[in-house]
From Swiss-Prot:
Keyword tRNA-binding assigned: no
InterPro entries the record matches: Arg_repress, Arg_repress_C, Arg_repress_C_sf, Arg_repress_DNA-bd, WH-like_DNA-bd_sf, WH_DNA-bd_sf
UniProt KW keywords: Amino-acid biosynthesis, Arginine biosynthesis, Cytoplasm, DNA-binding, Repressor, Transcription, Transcription regulation
Protein family per UniProt: Belongs to the ArgR family.
HAMAP family: Arg_repressor (MF_00173)
Top-level taxon of origin: Bacteria
Keyword DNA-binding: yes
GO molecular function: arginine binding; DNA binding; DNA-binding transcription factor activity
Function summary: Regulates arginine biosynthesis genes.
GO cellular component: cytoplasm
Alphabetical list of Gene3D superfamilies matching this protein: 3.30.1360.40, Winged helix-like DNA-binding domain superfamily/Winged helix DNA-binding domain (1.10.10.10)
Compartment(s): Cytoplasm
Name the record gives this protein: Arginine repressor
Length: 151
């Protein structure tokens, strides 16, 4: 069942029919799959889907191969500019706000950047918690994030 559902997700992505997880849930239900948003979220992560600009200030899901793969700092810069809409901090914690559905991709890019001051990220749908160690490095990390997001 999972393999069939994930094949259908890939078909829907290739057809450009889904822009949000809610769209995905509805499209899958129309195709006879009984799914929840949590199931779709896990499938998106397992399939490695990404959100890319789709025009008119909207984003859409795509396969990683639909966009040239960019590594390191340049990838982080692009992901931040495309997805991040706000930053805040408290002590050694930084909150990164993204467009809906953008948090997983941004959190992954942060993790892959390998900054030694960042010991981990937790990404939801539109919010990421970044844990910084040592605490005194949080200000510098926040400043780098602001620069990456164009702020």
């Amino acid at each position: 069942m999972k393999a069939r559902r994930q094949r259908k997700i890939l078909e829907l992505i290739k057809a450009g029919l889904v822009k949000t997880q809610e769209d995905m849930v509805n499209a899958l239900k129309e195709c006879g799959f009984n799914v929840t948003q949590a199931t779709v979220s896990r499938d998106i992560k397992e399939l490695g889907l990404i959100k890319i600009p789709g025009g008119n200030n909207a984003f859409r899901y795509a396969l990683p191969g639909d966009r040239p793969f960019i590594r390191g700092e340049e990838r982080l810069r692009r992901v931040f500019r495309d997805s991040v809409i706000g930053l805040d901090s408290s002590e050694n914690l930084i909150i990164v706000k993204t467009h809906p559905g953008g948090a997983q991709g941004v959190a992954s890019a942060i993790d892959q950047a390998g900054w030694r001051e960042i010991i981990g990220t937790v990404g939801g749908d539109d919010t990421i918690l970044v844990v910084v160690k040592p605490k005194r490095a949080a200000g510098a990390v926040l400043k780098r994030f602001e620069e990456l997001s164009g702020g």
